[in-house]
Amino acid sequence: EKKFTSKGNIIGMGGSAGGLLMGAVVNQAPDLFLGIVMAVPFVDSLTTNLDHSLPLTVGEFDEFGNAKDKKEHFDYIFSYAPYNNIKKMDYPNILITTSLSDNRVLFDEPAKFTAKLRDYKTDNNLLLLKTEMNAGHGGKSGRDGAIEEIAVDYAFALKIAGKLNTWSWNIKINYHINIVSRLMGLAKINLLN
């Protein structure tokens, strides 16, 4: 109604269970999105739910159900689980981040999801997996670490929207960023060229 955006120009962002949402919607309606940013996404939700030895599985039955003991829960989770619903089709540009020390969404979930997506996607759009070696579920610690993660997400969004070619950007994504010019100033990027 307000025409803020249009089909194929949306960039969705979500982390953890929000990453689960992004994974589900990108499988169901990939043509709506220009890109997706998924931070520590819970994308292998069915496998995780079936493993009652994992620390958070049993405690999250109220939220996600118990696929191991209830067939209707299994069927429902399977219907939207991002990993289980990857199809041979075009996907938008996707940035996935994971953390090696994440004890909520183990790093192998996003890695496994990315590998399967690489095998199945039929397009040439970006599919990036960024692994933080010294971070947990909440990302890097400290102000600079949080700003760096935000900068990476926005640099990716600006890159796929075609805006990085018109500005002077130069961020080093894998290591140090010059604090994004006091939070939201201009910076430069190297990763996506």
List each model region and its residues.
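Accessible peptide chain termini
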Residues: 1, 191-193
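Short hydrophobic targeting helices and cationic amphipathic motifs
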Residues: 175-176, 186, 191
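Active-site-proximal cap/loop segments of hydrolase catalytic domains
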Residues: 1-170
